[in-house]
């Protein structure tokens, strides 16, 4: 039987369904998973959609994803390889009445990762286009309830137009920094008294380069935070001007830099430290600025 195409009004439960499925996916991908995102129409509040949860994962190694095909099948996924897009791994769940789709790319594949995030973020912030897209999809679903090819072809022109517009306005710098930080974040047991990698950080310099670092934890408080490690890498490479900073905990959440690190940056850039942006909430893209630390 062909897939039955239905387009329904936005459902707040879609976000919860994404979160539940993301936990299962991260458990299977384990340390190979760098980042995971809710994408597609169900990720856009207020947008009517087919009730299918689209999920994108960025990984370090696609071959390890292939090795996990059996594990995905155990939670109901059909593993379809690239499925028409080079460098992707595509999985779907639910058969003809599909419920979830996963699109997996390596972290270096910014073209594919970026276009998905750009389209999503644009739709989240542009109501006129969001409403127009919803109308197009509802009309097509009524006209072609069992013809997915006609449904997709019917909205292709609009999607490509919006994707081009979205990419022209998209600043994916925070996303690139997040991926760079997560890509080096893994626990390293260096000795019985020293471990590293629980927290990672990325900084963007005034020259547009990204430097990363991981925390070093010791038994006697002689370690180094991830932010200062990233700054050390920047200075080693002959730069000293910071524009943005993101620190990430072991659960993938953005965290503010510690007081000592903030004070260090005010000394590094005494006349310009207040212009350094720090990411406070990566999922919702909320950021702030460095303020002088007072103990």
What are these regions (language model features)?
Residues 1-37:
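Helical scaffold of the NTase/Pol beta-like nucleotidyltransferase catalytic core
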Residues 77-110:
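Conserved catalytic core of two-metal-ion nucleotidyltransferases
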Residues 214-228:
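Compact, glycine-rich, soluble single-domain proteins
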Residues 67-75:
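Short amphipathic alpha-helices in soluble, non-transmembrane regions
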Residues 173-191, 239-295:
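C-terminal binding/interaction regions
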Residues 195-205:
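Short beta-strand scaffold segments in enzyme catalytic cores
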Residues 24-66:
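Active-site nucleotide-donor binding segment shared across nucleotidyl transfer reactions
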Residues 104, 111-171:
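Catalytic cores of NTP-dependent nucleotidyl/adenyl transfer enzymes across multiple folds
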